[in-house]
């Protein structure tokens, strides 16, 4: 195990945070691991893992976020709404394929339904699995392109009336991405860069693999490497790659860290505020709360907002405590498994750090 921690030595609390992260890292077994914390703009980064460090420091590698890409999609939608370019209640089919005949339930699906997993759509299209299963551990998404995602949506038969039940859906968020691209006449990757990445200064965040040796390499549970993820037509749901330092920048914008510069564009400030606001309760006695794009839990130190993600060989966790200046980003390069401790460890850092 190799460890590095970085934080200004003169800042009160920094050594304590470094010790907390070093202790937490012992619970995670992965070739590469990064645990990063921002406290009121002061960053502490712990790197480690069972593999030998490469020529690029672990905290400067871009990691696959998987489903932790969805907060980026949510912020993009919120900003487009703030700009008046779309509305949450716009019907997706009307924007994506005006006049195309669809099932009445599909006609009722709005942009809000797609983002909040209340569209009634399944997690993935039914015809996704036959082409994915033969290559489930290597490239399940690459053979299912954008036009196929759109066609699957237009011919869908939702399981439930839109807006009545919560069911996590990569399919739905992917459709949201294609719908926003159609509504604005701008490819998703360009739209995300213009509206989210560039304004927040996320220069090391992208949706495609970067130059050689700049991306982290994922691993199966047995330690063998896996190829970089190709998300096919599911880009909006899981294609973002970012360095842990960029992840902290993204989270610091959400947490409202006092020393961070206020967004120059009021629509960005409005979007950041909107995605922090609880909008949905579900489950037994409405115990589970969600914002537009974040899971929302209570903690001893106030509410926490978070999202985790996993790909074929990597994992990521993003979380923050609004109004407290605390943000946590974590990445690991081993495929998730039943006894995996990565998410629980990162969640513990977020919820138990004083």
What is the predicted role of each segment?
Residues 44-46, 307, 315-334:
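Short, well-ordered beta-strand elements
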Residues 11-65, 87, 209-210:
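Short, conserved catalytic-motif segment at the N-terminal edge
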Residues 63-66, 166-168:
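Catalytic tyrosine of NAD(P)H-dependent dehydrogenase/reductases that use a Tyr as the general acid/base
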Residues 42-45, 103-311:
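Short, surface-exposed loop or secondary-structure junction motifs
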Residues 18-21, 41, 64-92, 176-181, ...:
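Active-site SXXK
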Residues 87-102, 200:
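Short, glycine/proline-biased beta-turn/loop segments that scaffold the active-site neighborhood
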Residues 1-15, 352-354:
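Actinobacteria-biased recognition of intrinsically disordered, low-complexity terminal regions
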Residues 280-285, 299-300, 332-354:
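Short, gly/Ser/Thr-rich active-site loops of penicillin-recognizing serine hydrolases
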């Amino acid at each position: 195990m190799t460890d590095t921690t970085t934080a200004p030595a003169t800042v009160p609390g920094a050594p304590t945070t470094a010790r907390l992260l070093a202790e937490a890292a012992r619970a995670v077994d992965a070739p590469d691991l990064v645990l990063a914390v921002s406290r009121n703009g002061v960053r502490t980064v712990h790197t480690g893992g069972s593999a030998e460090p490469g020529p690029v420091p672990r905290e400067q590698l871009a990691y696959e976020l998987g489903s932790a890409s969805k907060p980026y999609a949510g912020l993009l939608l919120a900003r487009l709404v703030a700009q008046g370019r779309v509305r949450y209640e716009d019907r997706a089919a009307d924007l994506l394929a005006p006049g195309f005949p669809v099932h009445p339930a599909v006609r009722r699906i709005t942009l809000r339904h797609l983002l909040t997993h209340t569209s009634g759509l399944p997690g993935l299209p039914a015809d996704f699995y036959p082409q994915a299963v033969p290559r489930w551990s290597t490239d399940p998404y690459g053979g299912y392109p954008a036009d196929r995602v759109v066609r699957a949506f237009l011919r869908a038969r939702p399981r439930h009336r839109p807006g009545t039940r919560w069911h996590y859906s990569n399919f739905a968020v992917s459709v949201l991405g294609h719908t926003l691209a159609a509504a604005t006449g701008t490819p998703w990757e360009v739209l995300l860069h213009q509206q989210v990445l560039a304004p927040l200064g996320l220069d090391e965040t992208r949706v495609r693999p970067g130059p050689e040796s700049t991306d982290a390499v994922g691993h199966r549970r047995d330690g063998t490497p896996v190829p970089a993820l190709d998300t096919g037509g599911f880009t909006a749901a899981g294609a973002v790659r970012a360095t842990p330092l960029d992840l902290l920048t993204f989270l610091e914008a959400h947490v409202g860290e006092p020393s961070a510069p206020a967004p120059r564009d009021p629509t960005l400030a409005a979007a950041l505020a909107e995605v922090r606001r609880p909008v949905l309760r579900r489950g037994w006695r409405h115990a589970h709360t969600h914002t537009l794009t974040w899971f929302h839990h209570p903690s001893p130190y106030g509410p926490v907002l978070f999202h985790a993600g996993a790909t074929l060989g990597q994992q990521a966790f993003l979380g923050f405590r609004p109004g407290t200046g605390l943000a946590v980003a974590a990445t690991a390069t081993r495929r998730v498994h039943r006894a995996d401790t990565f998410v629980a460890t990162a969640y513990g850092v977020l919820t138990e750090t004083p």
